Amino acid sequence: MDGGCIGVICDTVGRAQHAAELLGNHCGRDCVRLTHSRFMDIDRMSNERELRDLLGPDATIGNGKRPGKLVVVGTQVLEQSLDIDFDALETDIAPDDLIMQRLGRVHRHRRGDGECDRPVSLQTATFYIRGVEAWNKEGPKFSRGADSVYDAAALMESLAVLDLTAAGASCAQQLPQDIARTVRSAYGNDPHGFLPHMWLPQYDDA
């Protein structure tokens, strides 16, 4: 990791703890923070206050408040009401409306002209989705724990509406313009109309 403030949102506490341990070993434990719903309220509130101080709108590289290198690993608490801003984000697969909400934590605040205060490689908002263990022709096999919180059918809809239907697939979203359109596509149409045909038996059984 060359620098930047990266968020990692996991669907379960166990996945968050595991990710934080791996990242701590790779990046250095001083660069990794963990927050999730099992923290005692007083500890979680203190943690969230520190995150706002480090990653909120008033924290900049110029005033020395925004760190040059930080990874924040958490559960859904990171998508809820925290006014924080990441240079890039990786998230477990989730229903489409939550994916859009999480995406709103990336480049939430302007960081210099043309985002010049961000690392060069992260000046374009970048968002990674994980939680698919295998891409089978009949549908995705979700990683253990990734489908324990949300219905597998909703996760398949989320991937399909974003056109992420194969390993290495990517899509581009314009925020906030695309949020309403993407959510409407996921919830306002018959999923059989946008899901890959080969996924339909697995989807109907989910």
Please provide the spans of the model-predicted regions.
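Conserved two-lobed SF2 helicase motor
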Residues: N63-E79, T91
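Flexible glycine/serine/alanine-rich "lid" or loop that lines and gates the nucleotide-sugar donor pocket
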Residues: D83
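C-terminal helicase lobe and adjacent C-terminal extensions/tails of nucleic-acid helicase motors
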Residues: M1-I9, G14, H18-D53, D58-G62, ...
